[in-house]
From Swiss-Prot:
GO biological process, one term: division septum assembly
Keyword presence, Ribosomal protein: no
Gene3D superfamilies assigned: P-loop containing nucleotide triphosphate hydrolases
Identification of the protein by name: Probable GTP-binding protein EngB
Pfam (any one): MMR_HSR1
Cofactor annotation: Mg(2+)
Keyword Signal: no
GO cellular component: cytosol
Organism: Vibrio cholerae serotype O1 (strain ATCC 39541 / Classical Ogawa 395 / O395)
Length: 220
């Protein structure tokens, strides 16, 4: 028996100002991170087929909370605050750079990192730093090049190949694909990657379900 994830059932659990205020470090967490204005909230909404799961902001970079969502039993998405926005004070930027590093290094339940980048402006300094931290911690990374609908097919494919070549320099497990919350490009790819990362927890849940099934009676 297998347990299938229904991403449309994903729901908000809590917000936290830093990792110390997150719920207990257990289960499997997949973190979503990206520069402000990369369409992270829209990507989460498209992934889950919900319009308002992650609230989009007209003032990027102002929301400095970690948002936790439950996908299934023991499976969570952690929406990390956007980084790198010009209007955010330097002190706040530095604080979040430290917090991101701490989260990647210390959160035992973190089993995968999705880094969202605008396909037209990928691999900025903080994007690269985030990937370096993840690779150093042995965390697999899925780079999603958002707003892929902004480029024509040929240019989109060329950009994906270019970023994949750049990603090879980091070593580790770093995949790169195009994504568009508007047209749906890459949604199935992202869900398949999350399924892969959540698989150990899903297998444990399936085993638990089988163990709870009543034994068939052998009485005549």
């Amino acid at each position: 028996m297998s347990v299938k994830i229904h991403y449309q059932n994903t729901h908000f659990i809590t917000s936290a100002p830093d990792i110390r205020h997150l719920p207990e470090d257990e289960g499997i967490e997949i973190a979503f991170a990206g520069r402000s204005n990369t369409g992270k909230s829209s990507s989460l909404n498209r992934l889950t087929n919900q319009k308002n799961l992650a609230k989009t902001s007209k003032t990027p970079g102002r929301t400095q909370l970690i948002n936790l969502f439950k996908v299934a039993d023991g499976c969570h998405i952690v929406d990390l605050p956007g980084y790198g926005f010009a209007q955010v004070p330097l002190e706040m930027k530095l604080k979040w750079q430290r917090a991101l590093g701490e989260y990647l290094q210390k959160r035992q339940s973190l089993k995968g990192l999705v880094v969202l980048m605008d396909i037209r402006h990928p691999m900025k300094d903080l994007d690269q730093q985030l990937i370096i931290w993840a690779v150093e911690c042995g965390i697999p990374v899925q780079v999603m090049l958002t707003k892929a609908d902004k480029l024509k097919s040929g240019a989109r494919k060329a950009q994906v190949l270019k970023v994949r070549e750049e990603a090879k320099t980091f070593g580790g497990d770093v995949a790169v694909d195009a994504f568009s919350s508007l047209s749906g490009i890459g949604v199935d790819t992202l869900r398949a990657k999350l399924d892969e990362w959540y698989a150990p927890m899903l297998a444990a849940l399936a085993e638990q379900e089988e163990g709870e099934q009543p034994e068939s009676s052998t009485d005549q």
